[in-house]
A protein has these predicted regions:
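Conserved N-terminal alpha-helix of the aminotransferase class I/II PLP-enzyme fold
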Residues: 1-25
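Conserved PLP-enzyme active-site core in the AAT-like
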Residues: 13-16, 26-232
Length: 232
């Protein structure tokens, strides 16, 4: 189908094994991630500053959170990412957890060391889920923090509508090679309509093509503008 063909192009652009169009916002993508790896009673390690959609996913599937408290920057008054040492400790204390969820980046643009978290989690037999609601540019910009797929994460939710140019409410759910794509698709059908808006899906396809062809140039200009603003 044309949708499947467009999803294949998206997977290629983002360096994923599979990609799914999400028309219920990244909230639906995050819920799809959690519910793809957790069932009732399963533990999932996550930062305390996760998006409410992750909490809603726990309510829906009955999974149990193991919270890692992020550090605070008291000068800026913002929360930071998860420290590797604290994730390692959470894995040690809860070896039966099914997954680790990482914000890549946080709402304020702060990244955890996702490469090391992926290494630790996979060594413990856990999946890594990345909420990349604010990380679309990581896949196409130059000298950016590492994207979840490049770091080896198993699933990632990407808000194309925030910094990728698609219409509000449109998003991608990316899968790594370790995931059963058909299982993920079935879970997605639990969290969003089976009659997706073609306006939203077309906007995802167009924005994907735009970033694949011009992403480096676009985000280079963004970096130049922000650098200029800082210096002024």
């Amino acid at each position: 189908s044309v949708i499947k063909d467009a999803e294949a192009l998206a997977a290629e652009a983002f360096g994923a094994e599979n990609a799914f169009f999400i028309v219920g916002g990244t909230s639906a993508a995050v819920q799809g991630m959690v519910m793809s790896v957790c069932k009732r009673g399963d533990k999932i390690i996550m930062p305390r500053n996760v998006h409410r959609s992750a909490i809603n996913a726990l309510i829906l599937c009955g999974a149990v959170p193991v919270y890692v408290n992020p550090q605070m920057d008291h000068t800026l008054g913002i929360s930071l990412g998860m420290r590797v040492e604290e994730v390692k400790d959470a894995i040690r204390r809860h070896p039966d957890a099914k997954a680790v969820l990482v914000n890549n980046p946080t709402y304020y643009g702060i990244c955890s060391n996702i490469r090391e978290i992926v290494r630790l989690a996979h060594a413990a037999g856990m999946k890594v889920l990345a909420d990349e609601a604010h990380g679309t540019h990581f896949y196409f910009g130059e000298n950016m923090p590492v994207s979840a797929m490049a770091a080896g994460a198993d699933l990632a939710s990407v808000s194309m509508h925030k910094s990728g140019g698609s219409l509000t409410q449109s998003s991608f759910l990316l899968c790594g090679p370790s995931m059963n794509a058909e299982h993920v698709r079935q879970i997605i059908n639990l969290t969003q309509t089976t009659s997706g808006s073609y306006l939203l899906m077309v906007s995802l396809d167009i924005s994907r093509k735009n970033l694949a062809l011009h992403g480096k140039e676009i985000f280079r200009k963004v970096v130049d503008l922000t650098t200029y603003a800082r210096e002024e």
